[in-house]
Amino acid sequence: MVENQRAMPQPEMRRIRRIHFVGIGGVGMCGIAEVLLNLGYEVSGSDLKGSAVTERLESFGAQIFVGHRAENTVGADVLVVSSAVNTSNPEVATALERRIPVVPRAEMLAELMRYRHGIAVAGTHGKTTTTSLIASVFAAGGLDPTFVIGGRLNAAGTNAQLGTSRYLIAEADESDASFLHLQPLVAVVTNIDADHMATYEGDFNKLKKTFVEFLHNLPFYGLAVMCIDDPVVREILPLVKRPTLTYGFSESADIRAINVRQDGMLTFFTVLRRDREPLDVSVNMPGNHNVLNSLATIAIATDEGVSDEAIVQGLSGFQGVGRRFQVYGELPVEGGNVMLVDDYGHHPREVSAVISAVRGGWPDRRLVMVYQPHRFSRTRDLYDDFVQVLADANVLLLMEVYPAGEEPIPGADSRNLCHSIRQRGQLDPIYIERGVELAPLVKPLLRAGDILLCQGAGDIGGLAPQLLKSPLFAGAKAAPTEGKLK
């Protein structure tokens, strides 16, 4: 029987009244700020420009500053910063001079988690979707979890929500190794891949050891939920000296999926659990990678005593996450329509998973892909992998690399990617120079029934809504808006 609606303990941050966020509009920062606002703390924050996110926080009572200035820190008891902010920032420099504590966002998240039943989701890919699925299933089970997610949960219309139960569900970010601040009771590792390697001095073994260290932050009575299908997770499994529960397609998994069938956006499968009856479920997301994300959720929900009925309901009613295979609507073309999809994937493994999902759900449709590589360093380090997976589209348009603050690296750009893909002989990609309007380029390439995928972690996120509103696609139909998480 699930323990329901236990009063959530408040963080005991003595002497802390006003909390200032440097870069409050960031996806990892705004959620924590929103939870703290709802807990009754005074919250202020600065960012280089205003956004819908900062407007939302302002409507909840946050004081928002546009631009970083020393005077923004007046009255702050602590500064919260992301890994992108350094000591040259005038607000950080002023705080250090005045002996105001400056803490990374993960340390503040750890403080919120300290007095709760923390569930932390780690892994190179799938963190946001898995965290969102867990929150949705717990909500369906009558629990009211607090969650902090790295994407917008469509059913809630936000990436964070303060609940009344003891559960706090959050992403654990390995990109800067800040997940080592967290001390959850349950931890998920979805997979381990070569990404953000600068943090680990280019040493993959160091990355693996850091994941083991993260899992050893669990208490001896905690639980590590691990995807046994991932070869690196399988490699570190014997090193984890905590209780473990494995999931995957493998016959050796504790929680296993069989009979997977995909029909468009819907994926159906049967779950096998030790000493339990088989459970038939469906999830409103395509692809085997989302079956794995669902299995992690089922493993945790089962262990926490959530009923099978709530698990089935939470998965089938899941409305997705912003920019994770998000269907924006339909674009009219001669003879019919094109399905417009936006996706955040920016690693070859993520790109491959999405392409496989399209092929599985819509096997007779062409995939027209607009892709924007993210970071020159990632493009350089994974160049051959990008060439291989991007060549699997039917039509490919490559935007220039989104730098994310990096300087260009010779050879690690979209022109060279186009050249290398063209040499494979599978398709002839189109290079898109920065600043070129995309709608006139894309429209002549589309046919009725196509799937148009806009993918990447940079400013390509604004392309799908732009196409939907373009006069060249007059009569475009937007997808239904989200509901509320209950």
From Swiss-Prot:
Keyword Cytoplasm attributed: yes
Keyword terms, alphabetized: ATP-binding, Cell cycle, Cell division, Cell shape, Cell wall biogenesis/degradation, Cytoplasm, Ligase, Nucleotide-binding, Peptidoglycan synthesis
Subcellular location: Cytoplasm
Positions annotated to bind ATP: 123-129
GO biological process, one term: peptidoglycan biosynthetic process
Main localization category: cytoplasm
InterPro entries: Mur-like_cat_sf (IPR036565), Mur_ligase_C (IPR004101), Mur_ligase_C_dom_sf (IPR036615), Mur_ligase_cen (IPR013221), Mur_ligase_N (IPR000713), MurCDEF_pg_biosynth (IPR050061), UDP-N-AcMur_Ala_ligase_MurC (IPR005758)
UniProt catalytic activity: UDP-N-acetyl-alpha-D-muramate + L-alanine + ATP = UDP-N-acetyl-alpha-D-muramoyl-L-alanine + ADP + phosphate + H(+)
Disulphide linkage map: none
Keyword Cell membrane annotated: no
A GO molecular function held by the record: ATP binding
Pathway: Cell wall biogenesis; peptidoglycan biosynthesis
Signal peptide span: none
Tree of life domain: Bacteria
CC annotations in GO: cytoplasm
Enzyme class: ligase
Similarity field: Belongs to the MurCDEF family.
PANTHER family on file: UDP-N-ACETYLMURAMATE--L-ALANINE LIGASE, UDP-N-ACETYLMURAMATE--L-ALANINE LIGASE-RELATED
Role summary: Cell wall formation.
Record protein name field: UDP-N-acetylmuramate--L-alanine ligase
Source organism of this protein record: Pseudomonas savastanoi pv. phaseolicola (strain 1448A / Race 6) (Pseudomonas syringae pv. phaseolicola (strain 1448A / Race 6))
